[in-house]
């Protein structure tokens, strides 16, 4: 996923949307901790209620669009690897709904910046590797990346039962000097870890597990 993060941000228009803009009159703001939780709910789950609350919290004309763009990255079942495999896509979505991702520690390098450590319990698909080595997903060919039927079948079974592994994911936020809403500076760390956990194929091709990097 790492090599695809910039492309994903550009495709979603997040880079432009996340630029600071003039704030509007806003309703009473939630606590910073709750605001950081909203971001996780939107990015990880695409939660509609959290998306609406985040859009209001941001307090700008772009707020709803930012929240919608962040929510769109949660739809991993729409990745090219899932095309033609609706059972695998449905299994992915069911497992994703059970993901727990909460705010851990928060560090403030400066008064108006925050580095938030999210504690996320994401599936560990290492047990899928033997099947993947026999049926790898090509990412550099003339066609969109697709799973072979053998891999899709194994994935559908394993994504439902794979053990969780806790990951600590740091995301940076900032706000205006006069206070206001916390804005995510770059959602790529959380987006990338989420995608790599559920769709590890690109990362496995780039950095085969067990090999020194």
Task: Please give the residue ranges for each predicted region.
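Bacterial N-terminal signal peptides that target proteins for export
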Residues: 2-13
């Amino acid at each position: 996923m790492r090599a695809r993060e910039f492309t994903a941000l550009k495709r979603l228009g997040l880079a432009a949307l996340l630029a600071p803009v003039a704030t509007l009159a806003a309703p009473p703001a939630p606590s910073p901790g709750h605001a950081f939780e909203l971001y996780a709910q939107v990015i990880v789950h695409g939660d509609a209620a959290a998306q609406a609350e985040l859009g209001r919290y941001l307090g700008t004309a772009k707020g709803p669009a930012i929240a919608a763009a962040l929510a769109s990255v949660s739809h991993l079942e729409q990745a090219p690897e899932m095309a033609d495999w609706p059972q695998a896509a449905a299994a992915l979505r069911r497992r994703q709904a059970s993901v727990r991702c909460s705010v851990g520690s928060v560090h403030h390098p400066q008064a108006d910046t925050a580095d938030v450590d999210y504690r996320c319990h994401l599936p560990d698909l290492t047990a899928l590797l033997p099947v993947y080595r026999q049926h790898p997903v090509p990412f550099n060919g003339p066609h969109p990346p697709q799973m072979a039927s053998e891999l899709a079948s194994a994935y559908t079974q394993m994504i439902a039962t794979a053990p969780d592994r806790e990951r600590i994911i740091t995301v940076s936020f900032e706000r205006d000097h006069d206070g206001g809403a916390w804005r995510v500076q770059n959602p790529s760390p959380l987006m990338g870890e989420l995608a790599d956990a559920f769709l590890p194929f690109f990362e496995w091709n780039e950095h085969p597990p067990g090999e020194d990097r």
